[in-house]
């Protein structure tokens, strides 16, 4: 039987993550015969696949899976998600919380070190968090700093840096005051956006994060080689405070975006983990070396409400109702995903003990006849005799192409609508989507911390994750209220109202909720894949 790990009931821990999946890569990445060298030297070397070139190793800038997966292993925050996916002491050895649950005081470990030998100080955290919020920095993850009192005002240009309530009281004491109590803040600070930055290094070389020979980290591993668009090598860090826990000597990350090539490399021993290609899922999913782990997040499509014809709500809803999520997961992706009929994924427990998704139910379902009615109504409202030309854009990757083709065919069959497909390389795609250059595009979302609000805040007006042009004052107010509501029952009610409004106005089409399906070398143990968060190799071992 396959190894299936169900992790939701353990209480999700925070982590970060937005993860639009990547596109192109060098398919020869990592094929250098280094495996044989590792065997003869007796080194424990883990071979994994990052799929694509990281966007950036500058903590608040990367803000995607291909950057933060490796970064989570070469840097570390005040807390780290443990094997049970709950936050545990990391750079901070302890902390205390005020009676009003708004002020946290963290004590930095005396033996916390950077890879260059400098001590990690409370000042490095104060510097990093204010750097993340600096409006001149333009960090997409800056909204995560809005938990801090004065953070949003500073980032929006309405406040001053000195008014951001995070202060290094001395080298080992960091004090931070929140806008409102947040029960999940200890998980938030495990997020890569909250990683420290060595102030002296950053001021001496503002591009310290761009190359392996200038990178300065503080995690279990140190970055030793970065062959751009090819591979990343990291080695066990001798300066890490908990180095005795780290069993691996090296980790080599390939950059191979094609899932079939990824699988072939696993079969030939060039990778220790691999994805399961959809076309092989029927024969592979029942193997003993397959791990299936729940993961928060979903695959979906975005409409640009500023481009015709998607300024019309009824036309958007018609497209959304024409999509059959069950067909896609059964016949296209074929990796045991759950169809998504709302935006917030399963795995978040309410005060009444129910799962948020179970309580909220299915908010949109395939309905061809209703979709046709809505399309006709929308076209009349816009005085369309014929819809404007429609292009669906996706990032260049076989998996994205297959889903886009299925959507294209479904819209043709159900609504008689012709949709043109277009694709582009990952980094260009990402920048153009942020700039609202697409009419209709593929997307994905991983929550930044383990709470439904992490999903829902993404569609507030002006949020860097919105990328649809959609704005709704009522929705913004519901999110603001939920973020500041102390009563959990009321808070969850506000979040349900917000999700219903989002799905009803349809700036998006949910497709499926994520899981993590991996083949894994049976000699490898201890890789931790968090339902909310990034792969953690601190505890990994290889016989």
Swiss-Prot record:
Pfam families: SBP_bac_5. Belongs to the bacterial solute-binding protein 5 family. A lipid is attached at residue 23 (S-diacylglycerol cysteine). Probably part of the ABC transporter DppBCDE involved in dipeptide transport. Gene3D superfamilies: Dipeptide-binding Protein, Domain 1, Dipeptide-binding Protein, Domain 3, Periplasmic binding protein-like II. Induction: Nutrient deficiency conditions. The gene is dppE. This is Dipeptide-binding protein DppE. Disruption phenotype: A null mutation abolishes the ability of a proline auxotroph to grow in a medium containing the dipeptide Pro-Gly as sole proline source. It is found in: Cell membrane. It is a lipid-anchor. GO terms for cellular component: ATP-binding cassette (ABC) transporter complex; periplasmic space. It comes from Bacillus subtilis (strain 168). Keywords: Cell membrane, Lipoprotein, Membrane, Palmitate, Peptide transport, Protein transport, Signal, Sporulation, Transport. GO terms for molecular function: peptide transmembrane transporter activity. GO terms for biological process: peptide transport; protein transport; sporulation resulting in formation of a cellular spore. Residues 1-22 form the signal peptide. A lipid is attached at residue 23 (N-palmitoyl cysteine). Its main location: membrane.
């Amino acid at each position: 039987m396959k190894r299936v790990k169900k992790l939701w009931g353990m209480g999700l821990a925070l982590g970060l993550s937005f993860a639009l999946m990547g596109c192109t890569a060098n398919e020869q990445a990592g094929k250098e015969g280094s495996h044989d060298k590792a065997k003869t030297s007796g080194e424990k070397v883990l071979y994994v696949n990052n799929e694509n070139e990281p966007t950036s190793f500058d903590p608040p800038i990367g803000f995607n899976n291909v950057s933060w997966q490796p970064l989570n292993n070469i840097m570390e925050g005040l807390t780290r998600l443990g094997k049970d996916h709950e936050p545990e002491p990391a750079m901070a050895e302890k902390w205390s919380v005020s009676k009003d649950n708004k002020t946290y005081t963290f004590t930095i470990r005396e033996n916390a070190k950077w890879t260059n030998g400098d001590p990690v100080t409370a000042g490095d955290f104060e510097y990093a968090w204010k750097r993340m919020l600096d409006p001149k920095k333009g960090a997409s993850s800056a909204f995560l700093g809005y938990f801090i009192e004065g953070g949003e005002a500073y980032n929006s240009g309405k406040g001053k840096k000195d008014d951001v309530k995070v202060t290094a009281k001395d080298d080992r004491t960091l004090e931070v005051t929140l806008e409102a109590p947040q029960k999940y803040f200890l998980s938030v600070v495990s997020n890569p956006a909250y990683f420290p930055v060595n102030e002296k290094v950053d001021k001496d070389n503002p591009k310290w994060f761009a190359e392996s020979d200038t990178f300065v980290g503080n995690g279990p591993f140190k970055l030793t080689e970065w062959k751009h668009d090819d591979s990343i090598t990291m080695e066990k860090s001798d300066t890490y405070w908990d180095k005795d826990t780290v069993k691996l000597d090296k980790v080599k990350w390939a950059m191979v975006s094609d899932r079939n090539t990824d699988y072939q490399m696993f079969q030939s021993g060039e990778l220790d983990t691999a994805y399961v290609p959809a076309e092989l899922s029927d024969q592979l999913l029942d193997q003993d070396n397959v791990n299936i782990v729940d993961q928060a997040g979903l695959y979906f499509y975005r409409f640009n409400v500023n481009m015709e014809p998607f300024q019309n709500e009824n036309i958007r809803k018609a497209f959304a109702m024409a999509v059959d999520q069950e067909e896609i997961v059964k016949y296209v992706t074929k990796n045991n995903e759950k169809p998504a009929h709302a935006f917030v994924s399963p795995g978040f427990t309410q005060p009444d003990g129910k799962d948020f998704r179970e309580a909220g139910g299915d908010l949109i379902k395939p309905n061809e006849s209703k979709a046709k009615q809505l399309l006709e109504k929308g076209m009349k409202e816009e005085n369309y005799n014929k819809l404007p030309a429609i292009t669906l854009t996706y990032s260049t990757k076989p998996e994205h192409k297959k889903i886009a083709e299925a959507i294209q065919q479904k819209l043709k069959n159900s609504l008689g609508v012709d949709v043109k497909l277009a694709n582009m390389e990952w980094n260009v795609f990402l920048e153009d989507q942020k700039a609202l250059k697409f009419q209709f595009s593929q997307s994905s979302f991983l929550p930044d911390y383990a709470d439904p609000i992490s999903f829902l805040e993404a569609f507030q007006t002006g949020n860097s994750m919105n990328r649809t042009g959609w704005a709704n004052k009522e929705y913004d107010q519901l999110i603001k209220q939920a973020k500041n509501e102390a009563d959990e029952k009321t808070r969850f009610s506000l979040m349900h109202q917000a999700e219903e409004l989002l799905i009803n106005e349809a700036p998006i089409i949910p497709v499926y909720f994520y899981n993590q399906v991996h083949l894994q070398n049976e000699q490898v143990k201890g890789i931790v894949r968090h339902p909310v968060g990034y792969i953690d190799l601190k505890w990994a071992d290889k016989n």
